Structures are given as C-alpha cells and as structure tokens.
C-alpha cells in the first residue's frame, strides 16, 4: 500500500467529516505532528495502532484508510 494512498484516503475521509487535523489528533490521542505526517505521506511506516486510532477518530474502518 502506497503511503500517499493512505494519506489521500485520510484527507478525503477527514474532509467528509469536516474535521481539522487538530481535531483528529485530539480524538485519536496522537500528536498533531504524527497526524500531519501521515496525511502528507511523510510517515513511511504508520503502525497498525496509529491507523486504528485514526480510523476510530474518523468513525471508519482501517480498511477504509487502506482502500
């Protein structure tokens, strides 16, 4: 799975919810830096824990982030 694809899906799903990066970070209990790096594709190896936290914050499945 391409990191840019994860970032693209993350950005799309976040926009659909109308959430800011700050809100996702807060809901996911992650640092803003982690969230920004994931969405921009800079984070080359997001852990399943990070992906799960993001998915839960967006109320979607991890599969939705990976599609």
Language model features: what each stretch is:
Residues 19-37:
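Short alpha-helical DNA-recognition segment
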């Amino acid at each position: 799975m391409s990191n840019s694809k994860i970032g693209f899906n993350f950005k799309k799903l976040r926009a659909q919810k109308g959430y800011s990066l700050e809100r996702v970070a807060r809901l996911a209990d992650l640092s803003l830096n982690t969230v920004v790096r994931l969405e921009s594709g800079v984070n080359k190896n997001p852990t399943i824990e990070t992906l799960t936290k993001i998915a839960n914050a967006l109320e979607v499945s991890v599969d939705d982030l990976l599609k």
